[in-house]
Design a protein with these regions (language model features):
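Catalytic cores of soluble, metal-dependent hydrolases
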Residues: 1-105
Length: 105
């Protein structure tokens, strides 16, 4: 996350897309544990302090969803039973899913 914040999401995603350019297909498994629980919630198994901000996750997933080689994007580790903020993690994840569906062509 430090490198992402230093270089910026756009620069990091350019690097990632370059590394993925030789792949035939891209399968993304987005673990919501990667998002900062102070900005989202603890509605996941292993919250990561100082993780991704929701807007960073949104930008990352938008780039991946637009990539013609992306065949699947899954979202894992949402656990409403652990959410102290009334399903906030599920709602944030739903927003990310909506972004992906709007961008995926």
């Amino acid at each position: 996350v430090d490198e992402l914040r230093t270089k910026g999401v756009s620069a990091i995603m350019n690097e990632i897309e370059t590394k993925l350019s030789d792949c035939d297909i891209i399968y993304v498994s987005f673990d919501v544990d990667s998002m900062d629980p102070d900005l989202t919630s603890h509605g996941t198994g292993t919250p990561v302090k100082n993780g991704l901000r929701p807007e960073e996750a949104n930008e990352i997933l938008t780039v991946l969803a637009k990539n013609k080689k992306t065949v699947c994007i899954e979202f894992v580790e949402v656990n409403p039973c652990l959410d102290e903020k009334a399903n906030t993690m599920a709602e944030i994840t739903l927003g990310l899913i909506e972004t992906v569906l709007n961008e995926y062509k």
